[in-house]
Amino acid sequence: MTEILAIDLATTTGYARGRVGDDAPMFGTVSFQGKDQNQVFAKALQWMMEMVRESPPQIVVIESMLPPQAMLNKTSRQVRDRLAGLHGVIRGCARRWGVGEISECGVGEVRKHFTGFRNMQRDNAKRAVMDQCKALGWNVRNDNEGDACAIWSYSASLIDPKQALRVSPLFNKGLRVTGW
């Protein structure tokens, strides 16, 4: 089956890796903190090489950057430039080490798939994603891991639509609300 590496990319990055059809991905968090942009990019490059050099997945999926107007007055140009640089580092390394498909997915589509809601307020959406992960038995430690697991689930569902049934209360009894 197809193996996916899903990445919620930022200076603190969440990742999830697994095959389509797996019960759960392997997931974690990595920090690329550094004294300057160059050190941040070097740490990201080293991490990605370790993730793909010996056994590259068939697909790497990265959460898309938001359009500049979405973050107007909420972030600095330096932060946006860093995120764009991280995207370049991850994409270049993945291609160099033989990953066949490198793609992006929008946060709205991922959240709609994983929680049923596309336009929740950011903090509520992150909490809903973590709650869904825990309901699935994926013991994520933070929202970075949760978002990466949601990206992995979304991507697996695009390859095999039956995978989408796992995150739907209609088809997964463990996710149903019982206290009405």
Features from the language model and the residues they span:
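Phosphate- and other anionic-substrate recognition elements at nucleic-acid/protein interfaces
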Residues: M1-W180
